[in-house]
C-alpha cells in the first residue's frame, strides 16, 4: 500500500468542517496543524482516567508516570535520540529556548560570540540577543543569499572565530521554506569547539529527523506543528546538559530530564505527543513498506516513524511543485523562496509570495472569505523579512502545505487567487 490520501484525511475531523456550505482548506499549517482523532482521544483519556501528579504510590499517579514516559520514548524515536531522558518538555519552543538560554549563559563570558542566522524565526534569534545584551556577548550574523535563499557556508567559516561559543540556526525557514544544511553547520560548530542549537520547528512536520546524524547539541521543535498538541520539545546531548546548571526550584530533581522541566507538565499534552508518534508509526507500518528498508538501522516504532516521514516528504514535494508552478503563472506574483522544480528537496512545502500591487493582509482576507486559510505578514521571521525588503510592505502571504493537503485544494487556491489579488 502506498500513500493513501483519503485514509490520511479521514483521521482529521477538522478537514470535514464547512462554513456556510463551503469546506475549509487549511493552508495555515506552519503556524499549527490539525490533529488526528487518536491524538484528541489520548488527551481526553488522560484527563478522564489518568489525571494525577507524578511519583505517587497509587494507580492514577502510576498511570500518569507511564503517560510521561511514553511521550519521552515516543519523541526519542521521532528524533532518533540516544536516550529518552535527553527529551525535555515545555510549554512551547519559545519558552524552552528562553529558559535554556539562561543556563547556557552561565558558561559564557563578556566578549564571547554567538552566531545567529538572518533566516530564523525570532524565537531562535531574540532569546540569544537578549542574552548577549545581558552578558556583553558579541552577535555575528549569518546572512542568506537573496537570490538562492540559501546560506553560503564559506561565509559561516569567516564568521567563526576562537571566541565563537554557540551557533544557532533553523533547520527550515518558516517564511522562505529553505531547508538548511544543518549537518554541515553543526560540523563546523564542533570543529570550533562551539555548541550548536537547531530550531527544528518547521522541518519536523515534513522530513525524518535524526539528531545523531545531524550532530547538533540541542534540537527544539513543537508538536502542534506536526499534528500534536500545543507542547514544546527539546532534545539535548546528555554530556552537554551535564555542563549546564538548570534554573529550578529546590525540591525539583537534580537529574535529567526533570531538572530542566519547571513545574508540572501538561500530562494530557504529553499523552497527545505519544499518540502523535503512534500516528506516524501507523503510516510507516501501513503505507511506507517501500521506505522501511531505507531505515533498517532502526527497529520497531523508530523505523516506522522515519519511513513515514520519508513517504510524507516525497508526497509533499509533489504538492509544492504544483503550487509553485501555479503561482509563477500568475502575473505580478513573486515567490520568496526556491522555485526550481528540480530543487524541491531543498525546501519544505512552506511557500510565501508577494504581489506587485496587492497587500499581503488584503490577499489573506480575501482568501479567508473563500474559506482558504493562509497567513500574512512577517510570521515572526523578522530578520528574513528585513533581508528580503518586505518588512515595510506587509511581509508576504504564506501558504503552508502538509501531508493531509491535496492537489485539488491547491488548484482551488490557484483558481480563487486572481479574484483575491483583485480585491
Model-derived features with residue positions:
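Pyridoxal 5′-phosphate
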Residues: 1-423
